[in-house]
Amino acid sequence: IPLPGYHQVRSFMEIQAKAAPLNRSVSTLDEYLDVCWVIFQGFKKFGAVAFKDQSAYFRTLDYSNPTRDDAERVFNRLMADGLRSAGYPDELRPLDDYLFHAFLRMARDLDLPVQLHTGHLAGLSGALRKAHAAPRADLFLLHRDVRFELFHANWPHGGELLFLAKAFPNVVMNFCWAHAIDPIYCQALMREAVSAVPHAKVHAFGADYGGFGLPPGGGYVDRAWAHLQLALDNMAI
């Protein structure tokens, strides 16, 4: 379930578009939260196994904990003018951050893990501080009943990932994509992980390629298979 599109809503029209699959319209923050809850339940019913948040491509992951009043003020401003769009990221941030926390509580209630993009960013999308997992420790502590998976082996910050997976019962490490990014890093990190972290919290393989539709937007099952071969070879060395 792709989370950013639901908590980074910037305009009246974006919000209404999220409610359209239910043939509903939205005028209040409560109505929007209810729409998202119904949609997320539907995702799970039809086979979704996790939430995924790749917000690191667009912002730093230092989510504040704004009040509902602050978030509702931004939301109501968008509702007051169908042509208005909130400035990003600063003007939108109270709503963005509030919704993110609300959706984590929904993930808890649906008993679905939350996958967070950490570490390397594809392309030139870059600032190191955007995707580093270590500053997220407060988030893992606040939402202790939510299961988090930290993606891409937090490359290149392996030590911090080991600490988070060992120190927080609700955090697991996931090597998806990492075997293609840096095989030697993965070998070294795995050696440390098997001696320092409970084995059930180490997911040694994953490939988060889209599997739906036709290329270029999806249909990448072959790439997931290829990544599996890389991971198998890499872990066998």
Model-predicted regions and their roles:
Residues C36, D96, F100, C186:
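Aromatic/hydrophobic pocket-lining residues that form the small-molecule binding cavity
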Residues P135-D138, H143-I237:
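H/E-rich (His + Asp/Glu) clusters that bind or coordinate divalent metals
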